[in-house]
């Protein structure tokens, strides 16, 4: 009898997908991004709040893996709980989030290269140069071809990249601990402040005040998008659950991944506060850890961190090339996208989904030449859209808890939903509004899938599509015509146009 080797993604490879997906570029900008809006005390409270919210999300995933082992991925959960249309919104939103996140990786990678060759790869307003657009386009197509050769092969490569990317972060942590100055760290630990900006947009100085409740809430709000972004990817093992050697490994990988990520993020966000004063930290160029380590130990440190960041971004980029096509393939299997999206090549990779995703990435890579602060724009959009997917995971577990009278599932589901909804309301709804344009395009495919499978579209689904389409059209109108500068509806200002 022929002995066939069992294929599938191992526990270590699943863990690598989570860590490589989450530790992309955001962690390298974490300290200086947080310093612009939060003191060390505010950062600690923010980590407690956001850590609790992410823990609830992880527990929701793990509970659903256990009680609904036949389901896999965020769209599966949303569809099972709330029907085809909501399942489509979740899966399509996950797809949007994943590939817009890769644009953020591309921008930050070129910003890192700018450390070695100043002004060659990034413009002063945060947009990419034409040279950068060409380079990241080539890299993006290479990564697509790698995944097209087989998702399991790509996952193995990702495990190697994970180890390589952690080395400079460990070096930074050790250096930060050795050079830590308690008096610098505690100088303004529990205060709030107003910021005076210089003409070039840099922080001129902070005016310090005693901490107040409103001041603390403002610091937490200012930290939300930055902190939630660095956890996007925590669901990677769940999304790849159908390809795992053992389904139970997905839950283990998610819990271990959360613990590892929390330790890394808390260290890397707080240690710089103990090395330089907050105004200096807030003015550090992006990517922050590159220039902070350069300040700590000299040029070799900055070079090590810049190389580590580029490896990190390539690893995250590879992970995020796998995740969006898993989402579209699952939608096709659920008959929420045309079957064309679910077709596999001889390497069992969804080639058609990869091609469509890559074409969207290519279009938006070109757009980075025109968008100011392109990194923040794309990572904020990716974070805001995926919050909807995460909220639906919590809502589904909450619904199951009510049906089964399980207090544990009710509480975990409720806190997951409440955290994601609150975070989205406080800091990201404008980006979701922009994403409505892409949702509207997806409805054409949803309608096509329904016709292909000879299913009718309900009145509620038509109404849902109408509401989202109207919002998408309004977003286009505001982008073209503009809105009052500085208001919440100023989408052109949001994009730096």
UniProtKB/Swiss-Prot annotation:
Q: Does the keyword Membrane apply?
A: yes
Q: What is its main location?
A: membrane
For the null mutant, the annotation states: Deletion does not affect the growth enhancement observed in the presence of high L-arginine in different growth media, and uptake activities are slightly reduced.
Q: Where in the cell is it found?
A: Cell membrane
Q: Which GO terms describe its molecular function?
A: antiporter activity
Q: Which GO terms describe its biological process?
A: amino acid transport
Q: Where are the transmembrane segments?
A: 8-28, 41-61, 88-108, 127-147, 160-180, 220-240, 255-275, 297-317, 354-374, 378-398, 406-426, 429-449, 462-482
Q: What topology in the membrane does the UniProt record assign?
A: Multi-pass membrane protein
What reaction does this catalyse?
Answer: L-ornithine(in) + L-arginine(out) = L-ornithine(out) + L-arginine(in)
Q: What superkingdom heads the lineage?
A: Bacteria
Keywords attached to this entry: Amino-acid transport, Antiport, Cell membrane, Membrane, Transmembrane, Transmembrane helix, Transport
Pfam families reported in the protein's UniProt record:
AA_permease_2
| Family in the record | Belongs to the amino acid-polyamine-organocation (APC) superfamily. Basic amino acid/polyamine antiporter (APA) (TC 2.A.3.2) family.
- Record protein name field: Arginine/ornithine antiporter ArcD2
What's the gene? arcD2
């Amino acid at each position: 009898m022929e002995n066939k080797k069992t294929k599938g993604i191992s526990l270590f490879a699943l863990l690598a997908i989570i860590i490589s997906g989450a530790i992309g570029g955001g962690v390298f900008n974490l300290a200086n991004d947080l310093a612009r809006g939060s003191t060390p005390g505010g950062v600690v409270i923010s980590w407690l709040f956001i850590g609790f919210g992410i823990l609830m999300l992880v527990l929701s995933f793990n509970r659903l893996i256990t009680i609904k082992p036949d389901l896999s991925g965020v769209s599966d959960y949303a569809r099972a709980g709330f029907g085809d249309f909501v399942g489509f919104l979740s899966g399509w939103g996950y797809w949007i989030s994943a590939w817009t996140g890769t644009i953020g990786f591309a921008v930050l990678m070129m910003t890192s290269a700018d450390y070695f060759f100043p002004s060659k790869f990034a413009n002063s307003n945060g947009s990419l140069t034409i040279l950068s657009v060409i380079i990241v386009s080539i890299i993006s197509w290479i990564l697509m071809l790698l995944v097209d050769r087989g998702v399991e092969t790509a996952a193995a490569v990702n495990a190697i990249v994970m180890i390589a990317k952690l080395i400079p972060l460990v070096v930074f942590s050790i250096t930060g601990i050795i050079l830590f100055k308690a008096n610098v760290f505690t100088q303004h630990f529990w205060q709030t402040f107003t910021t005076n900006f210089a003409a070039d947009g840099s922080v001129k100085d902070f005016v310090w005040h005693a901490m107040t409740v409103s001041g603390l809430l403002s610091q937490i709000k200012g930290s939300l998008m930055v902190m939630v972004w660095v956890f996007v990817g925590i669901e990677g093992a769940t999304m790849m659950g159908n390809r795992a050697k053992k389904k139970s490994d997905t839950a283990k990988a998610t819990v271990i991944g959360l613990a590892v990520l929390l330790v890394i993020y808390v260290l890397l966000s707080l240690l710089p506060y103990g090395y330089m004063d907050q105004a200096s930290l807030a003015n550090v160029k992006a990517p922050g850890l590159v220039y902070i380590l350069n300040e700590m130990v000299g040029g070799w440190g900055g070079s090590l961190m810049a190389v580590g960041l580029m490896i990190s971004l390539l690893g995250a980029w590879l992970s995020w090339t796998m995740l969006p096509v898993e989402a579209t393939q699952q939608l096709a299997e659920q008959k929420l996208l045309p079957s064309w999206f679910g077709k596999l090549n001889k390497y069992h990779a969804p080639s058609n989904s990869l091609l469509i995703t890559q074409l969207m990435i290519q279009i938006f890579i070109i757009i980075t030449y025109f968008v100011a602060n392109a990194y923040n724009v794309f990572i904020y959009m990716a974070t805001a859209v995926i919050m909807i997917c995460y909220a639906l995971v919590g809502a589904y577990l909450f619904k199951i808890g009510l049906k089964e009278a399980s207090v544990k599932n009710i509480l975990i589901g409720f806190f997951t939903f409440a955290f994601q909804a609150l975070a989205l309301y406080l800091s990201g709804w404008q980006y979701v509004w922009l994403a409505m344009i892409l949702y509207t395009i997806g409805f054409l495919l949803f309608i096509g899938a329904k016709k292909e499978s000879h299913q009718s579209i309900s009145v509620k689904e038509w109404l849902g599509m109408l509401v989202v389409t109207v919002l998408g059209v309004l977003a286009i109108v505001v982008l073209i015509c503009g809105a009052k500068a500085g208001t919440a509806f100023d989408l052109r200002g949001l994009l730096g146009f």
